[in-house]
Amino acid sequence: MTSPAQRHMMRVSAAMTAQREAAPLRHATVYEQMLVKLAADQRTLKAIYSKELKAAKKRELLPFWLPWVNGVLELGKGAQDDILMTVMLWRLDTGDIAGALEIARYALKYGLTMPGKHRRTPPYMFTEEVALAAMRAHAAGESVDTRLLTETLELTATADMPDEVRAKLHKITGLFLRDGGDAAGALAHLQRATQLDCQAGVKKEIERLERELKPKPEPQPKAATRAPRKTRSVTPAKRGRPKKKAS
């Protein structure tokens, strides 16, 4: 646990090093110290086999890095920062889509790259991991703000990535919109998902939503029917019987 003074110093140091636009941070002493700490955290995580336990450990470790992240996002000018990019990925692993999106806006604006052996580009990685985080939440019956999902789609709209990856995010966005009662919005995202990936597994849901949204024929007004007039029947005896004379 860091003290308020340590957190402040960490935030200021992060801001100062991140202002070295286009300059490698490996020469920044504080940055090097933080990389040593990050490497130790990563070794701790590597020793954990369970994905669930690993996510819980990341959730425990993340608060330490918050001052660094805040310092970079507030005053940074786009220098490559492996700490920031690692924290973005950890936030996604713990289901913090909003927190990861906060970093992604900065990272994509300045063209930061993923550290180490990551082969996916940041937009590709971010889109896929947001989709997976949202899918995990949906499977657990948890809610996700669909505005975070649609912003992710907009933020990465021009980036190159496998169509199947973008389809995943459209699919889960559509499912959350459906659950929220937005049938039209859900249909649009599910249709886009199947356009990108015919194996997206949403065809039946699309058919159901199309039936739901199909205009129902208005009931025709019933024609007014007149009741037949009752005629007074006259018996044959009455027709031939003479009227009584007055006495």
Curated annotation (Swiss-Prot):
GO terms for MF: DNA binding; endonuclease activity
Keywords: DNA-binding, Endonuclease, Hydrolase, Nuclease, Viral genome packaging, Viral release from host cell
Extent of Basic and acidic residues compositional bias: 209-219
One Pfam family named in its UniProt record: Phage_term_smal
Disulfide bonds: none
Keyword Nuclease: yes
Region called Disordered, residue ranges: 209-247
Ranges of biased composition (kind: Basic residues): 227-247
GO biological process: viral capsid assembly
Its biological purpose: M protein is probably an endonuclease which directs cos cleavage. The Q, P and M proteins are needed to package DNA into proheads and for the conversion of proheads to capsids.
Name by which UniProt lists this protein: Terminase, endonuclease subunit
Primary gene name: M
